[in-house]
Amino acid sequence: MNLKQFPRHSLTFGPTPIHPLSRLSESLGGKVELYAKRDDCNSGLAFGGNKTRKLEYVIPDVLAQGADTLVSIGGIQSNHTRQVAAIAAHLGLKCVLVQENWVNYSDAVYDRVGNIQMSRIMGADVRLVSEGFDIGIRPSWEEAMESVRKAGGKPYPIPAGCSEHPLGGLGYVGFAEEVREQEAGLGFRFDYIVVCSVTGSTQAGMVVGFAADGRADRVIGIDASAKPEPTRAQILRIARHTAELVGLGRDITEADVVLDTRYGGPEYGLPSAGTLEAIRLSARLEGMMTDPVYEGKSMQGMIDMVRRGEFPQGSKVLFAHLGGVPALNAYSFLFKDG
């Protein structure tokens, strides 16, 4: 497997830290050791996150093509579009963001705080669109690219979550390689890796990266889309493509893609009582913030699996913290009492 063949434009601080979640582990019985790898702290570009790691492999193509405008898409509180806006500002590029109404949630300031607020501050052309949630290619995004062309610009398309981009899975192959290097220093290997999945390329990259040492099916995806079958299919497709790109040397099978569908509800972007409990528990025991859309749901899944005894006693479980905390402001009503 060869990731070094692909050019990478550094946007992150370097390897993200891994630290124990000792108080959380103890509160859940102490039979499973929980750790977190902090990709939520990976960059100085508007707080970074998992999309920043992915975009390190996309930006060389942007620059090679001579594009002058990054065009991307997400929900109103998209972490991805905030990271695209930050990178555009950092590189001196223009940025057009299509922000669709993906979440069935009403808050007086939902479209004015958090991620979308930062994107506007960074100078992005933010375009609110009424269409609902879908992880596929969207007409509104294609229309935005055409508008840039008509204005004389040269757009570069970055799909939702960077997932449909041909290079979108590479960053999290690198994540797996990074974990292996850190494991050598820690003196042990993680038995399971827990990660949130919606558009799919984060888990897909991990599946390929950990397949190199036989742990593909130890990557436990927690679905947060509440539409798990399209998500599962997209993870598998991206993983197979990425495996070919890096020369994994074996096929990725359906058995390699583990997606737990118990925690995505009630809808995309809407937290359950269990999600809110997980957000508060990790915050109050570890000072580690998670969000209602993504990481709160994967944290809920990990906590529930420990409580149910689904990880064997003595397991070491790595929680991949992908970011998402800037969206908390948009859900302020849910946390008015803490």
From Swiss-Prot:
<dbReference type="GO" id="GO:0009310">
    <property type="term" value="P:amine catabolic process"/>
</dbReference>
<comment type="subunit">
    <text>Homotrimer.</text>
</comment>
<comment type="function">
    <text>Catalyzes a cyclopropane ring-opening reaction, the irreversible conversion of 1-aminocyclopropane-1-carboxylate (ACC) to ammonia and alpha-ketobutyrate. Allows growth on ACC as a nitrogen source.</text>
</comment>
<feature type="active site" description="Nucleophile">
    <location>
        <position position="78"/>
    </location>
</feature>
<dbReference type="InterPro" id="IPR036052">
    <property type="entry name" value="TrpB-like_PALP_sf"/>
</dbReference>
<dbReference type="GO" id="GO:0030170">
    <property type="term" value="F:pyridoxal phosphate binding"/>
</dbReference>
<protein>
    <recommendedName>
        <fullName>1-aminocyclopropane-1-carboxylate deaminase</fullName>
        <ecNumber>3.5.99.7</ecNumber>
    </recommendedName>
</protein>
<dbReference type="InterPro" id="IPR027278">
    <property type="entry name" value="ACCD_DCysDesulf"/>
</dbReference>
<keyword id="KW-0378">Hydrolase</keyword>
<dbReference type="Pfam" id="PF00291">
    <property type="entry name" value="PALP"/>
</dbReference>
<feature type="modified residue" description="N6-(pyridoxal phosphate)lysine">
    <location>
        <position position="51"/>
    </location>
</feature>
<keyword id="KW-0663">Pyridoxal phosphate</keyword>
<dbReference type="InterPro" id="IPR001926">
    <property type="entry name" value="TrpB-like_PALP"/>
</dbReference>
<comment type="similarity">
    <text>Belongs to the ACC deaminase/D-cysteine desulfhydrase family.</text>
</comment>
<dbReference type="GO" id="GO:0018871">
    <property type="term" value="P:1-aminocyclopropane-1-carboxylate metabolic process"/>
</dbReference>
<dbReference type="GO" id="GO:0008660">
    <property type="term" value="F:1-aminocyclopropane-1-carboxylate deaminase activity"/>
</dbReference>
<dbReference type="InterPro" id="IPR020601">
    <property type="entry name" value="ACP_carboxylate_deaminase_bac"/>
</dbReference>
<dbReference type="GO" id="GO:0019148">
    <property type="term" value="F:D-cysteine desulfhydrase activity"/>
</dbReference>
<dbReference type="InterPro" id="IPR005965">
    <property type="entry name" value="ACP_carboxylate_deaminase"/>
</dbReference>
